[in-house]
UniProtKB/Swiss-Prot annotation:
One of its GO terms (biological process) is mRNA catabolic process. Coiled coil: none annotated. Pfam families: KH_1, PNPase, RNase_PH, RNase_PH_C, S1. SMART domains: KH, S1. It is found in: Cytoplasm. It comes from Syntrophomonas wolfei subsp. wolfei (strain DSM 2245B / Goettingen). This is Polyribonucleotide nucleotidyltransferase. Gene3D superfamilies: GHMP Kinase, N-terminal domain, K Homology domain, type 1, Nucleic acid-binding proteins. Keywords: Cytoplasm, Magnesium, Metal-binding, Nucleotidyltransferase, RNA-binding, Transferase. Its cofactor is Mg(2+).
Length: 703
């Protein structure tokens, strides 16, 4: 067994690729070491094409292992279960830049597995896995037009940084994952803190310079250990038959696609497709599949030609024209906030729920973030596209779209100090014809403002498309479903008036250059501002008051040493407060205490109980107290009453301090149960409280 090791530096840390030591049964395997982060990436391929499919069967799995960060998995079973949301997002991150680089028409099943074996938090395993996937595929016999590489770009104090450390990431206004080949960008994914479009552009191409170096590094590896690629036999239709199909199908599709209504257009396109097949399969029955493929390509060519040569789209819009936008808030009466966003035939209902801080989501992954208090979920039911499918929970697409919309709003969500609530937004896609994820961004903004969440600025989003033939290209604003399916790029961008908060770019060709990225960013901003203006017509700022159905929140700060008094032995005291008031109470280690109630009176009552428990006796302060015990030398007076079975705070009024004149017997002045005004004169070293009634009487006489 020959083991090969290759090394280069990326962002000042060693990137080591090991070939030949592990996973030798796979078509290709690479053990990637980036600092102390270790990722094994394997690529395997079926020997024969999968029959009866019209798509490329690529599967990418990202396997997080808890031992990689020295953890034992939680739960009863104590082993890793189904993929976490973060693992799903990482798998998608690997899939997107490699998928366009396989041969067109390739139908062999491909399985790429990235297993995370060790994680050093300064060195991200997901982008390391993208480079690892490229190495594994490139050195294997699987046909692949790579290599590709990926890096993360941060922005700290105005300076762009490759692969920022955890400390740098916490200060960064940008977290952008960029993947590409030596020639072009393939994929961009990230979030930002209202960063200008020009800076985003610079970040993308700053990343590309580093990517080129990593690609050069991979090419050296491939030259040394790369295998010969397997022969792929992709059936091709006879040129004469193909020419006849194109000539027959083109006028049918030119008429069918020019219908603004999605359902009518799809019906006409299906009818045209059937006409083509009926016309040719009688003469060439054995070529039916290839004829259908050419017919699909013809339809695609018609749509693309309209955009490139005529500057027109299937629904009659210009390239930069946005579909009709309508916005409504308060669509639902009982939820804490709701917004209905409609753009053309895409419609999203976003609903906001406010909850206690303790309801924030706790994450059991490999990252440094262990909890989050802003949560966005995206649902895409089959009826939204007029289809019938089983509904079995969120798939990879729903998780990815939900995360993108969540990232878009994260930069404007108020801090816990400003707004001590956990916030959950659910976006229900009611109708979809393109860009439902960006519809979720707009709907979320409307819903949050209606709920009274003091977001820093409203956020709008838009999806851009691309048609590219040679050096010619056309960029389309607010793409619909057919333009997404038949175009070369899906470029989603969200942000405020000030700048970008989220960006996602998926390329279906072999990459895009600087000119295209610049043009797309500029045109996207114009579209975003148009949509934002429409949104602000529905609601121009967050409501000042929360919904009457939202929980009332009182925030208190108590001495951390008093936390155990509020909780009580075995939680007895805090449970009594909850039972008595119906409130929910959360206490943090720093003494931050949150009272959440369905009505204001209950919250005030709970606050009174807490204040009574943690109250401290103050020297010099006058209290109305109750005489609890009488001794020969004085009376013990409770000055802070106990609540819910807790002990109150009392002090001693010495017999000499009961009155201005001499007192022979305590009971001559006070008796048990009497309420008297007393002043705290001293708290001695043992914590004993000395009180004086005489001092209060003297003060009253002076007045």
């Amino acid at each position: 067994m020959i083991v090969k090791k290759y090394q280069m530096e990326v962002a000042g840390r060693p990137l080591i690729v090991e070939i030949g030591q592990v996973a030798q049964q796979a078509n290709g395997a690479a053990l990637m070491r980036y600092g102390d982060t270790v990722v094994l990436v394997t690529a395997t391929a079926a020997k024969q094409p999968r029959e009866g499919i019209d798509f490329f069967p690529l599967t990418v799995d990202y396997e997080e292992k808890q031992y990689a960060v020295g953890k034992i998995p939680g739960g009863f079973i104590k082993r890793e279960g189904r993929a976490t949301a973060q693992a799903t997002l990482s798998a998608r991150l690997i899939d997107r830049p490699i998928r366009p680089l396989f041969p067109k028409g390739f139908r062999n099943e491909i399985h790429v597995v990235a297993t995370i074996l060790s994680v050093e938090k300064d060195n991200a395993p997901d982008v390391t896995a993208i480079t690892g996937a490229s190495v594994a595929l490139s050195i294997s016999d699987i046909p692949f037009a790579g290599p590709v590489a990926a890096v993360i770009v941060g922005l700290v104090d105005g300076e762009l940084i490759i692969n920022p450390t955890v400390e740098q990431h916490q200060k960064s206004d940008l977290h952008l994952a960029v993947a590409g080949t030596k020639e072009a960008i393939m994929m961009v994914e990230g979030g930002a803190n209202e960063v200008p479009e020009e800076t985003m552009r610079d970040a993308i191409f700053f990343a590309h310079e580093e990517i080129k170096k990593i690609v050069d590094f991979q090419e050296n590896i491939i030259r040394e250990v790369g295998l010969s690629k397997m022969q792929v036999e992709i059936p091709i239709l006879d040129e004469e038959i193909k020419k006849a199909v194109v000539e027959f199908a083109t006028p049918l599709f030119e008429e069918a696609v020019k219908n603004p209504d999605k359902k009518t257009r799809e019906d006409q396109m299906d009818s045209s497709q059937k006409s083509v097949l009926q016309h040719f399969t009688e003469s060439y029955p054995e070529e039916e599949k290839l004829i259908a493929d050419v017919s699909d390509e013809t339809m695609k060519a018609v749509v693309r030609k309209m955009a490139l040569e005529e500057g027109e789209r299937v629904d009659g819009r210009k390239l930069d024209e946005i579909r009709k936008v309508s916005c409504e808030v308060g669509f639902l009466p009982r939820p804490h906030g709701s917004g209905l966003f409609t753009r053309g035939q895409t419609q999203v209902l976003s609903v906001t729920t406010l909850g206690a801080i303790s309801e924030e989501q706790r994450l059991d992954g490999l990252g440094i973030e262990e909890k989050k208090r802003y949560i966005h979920h995206y649902n895409f039911p089959p009826y939204s596209t007029g289809e019938t499918k089983p509904m079995r929970g969120p798939g990879r697409r729903e998780i990815g779209h939900g995360a993108l919309a969540e990232r878009a709003l994260l930069a404007v969500i108020p801090s816990e100090e400003e707004f001590p609530y956990t916030i959950r937004v659910v976006s229900e896609v009611l109708e979809s014809n393109g860009s439902s994820s960006m519809g979720s961004v707009c709907g979320s903004t409307l819903s949050l403002m209606h709920a009274g969440v003091p977001i820093k600025a409203p956020v709008s989003g838009i999806a851009m498309g691309l048609v590219k033939e040679g050096e010619r290209f056309a960029i389309m604003s607010d793409i619909q479903g057919i333009e997404d399916a038949l175009g070369d790029m899906d470029f989603k961008l969200a942000g405020t008036e000030k700048g970008v908060t989220a960006l996602q770019m998926d390329i279906k060709i072999t990459g895009v250059n600087r000119e295209i990225v610049e043009a797309a960013l500029k045109q996207a901003r114009e579209g975003r501002m148009f949509i934002l203006k429409k949104m602000l017509e529905a609601i121009d700022k967050p409501n000042e008051e929360l919904s009457p159905y939202a929980p009332q929140m009182i925030r208190m700060q108590i001495d951390p040493d008093k936390i155990r008094e509020v909780i009580g032995p075995g939680g007895k005291t805090i449970h009594k407060i909850v039972d008595e008031t119906g409130c929910k109470i959360d206490i943090e280690d720093d003494g931050s205490l949150f009272i959440m109630a369905t009505d204001e009176e209950a919250a005030k009552k709970a606050r009174f109980f807490v204040e009574s428990i943690v109250a401290e006796v103050e020297v010099g302060k006058t209290y109305m107290g109750t005489v609890k015990r009488i001794m020969d030398f004085g009376a013990f007076v409770e000055i802070i009453p106990g609540v819910l079975g807790t002990s109150g705070k009392e002090g001693l009024v010495h017999i000499s301090q009961l009155a201005e004149e001499r007192v022979n017997k305590v009971r001559d002045v006070v008796d048990i149960g009497d309420q008297i005004l007393v002043k705290v004169t001293e708290i001695d070293r043992q914590g004993r409280v000395n009180l004086s009634r005489k001092a209060v009487l003297k003060s009253a006489v002076k007045k």
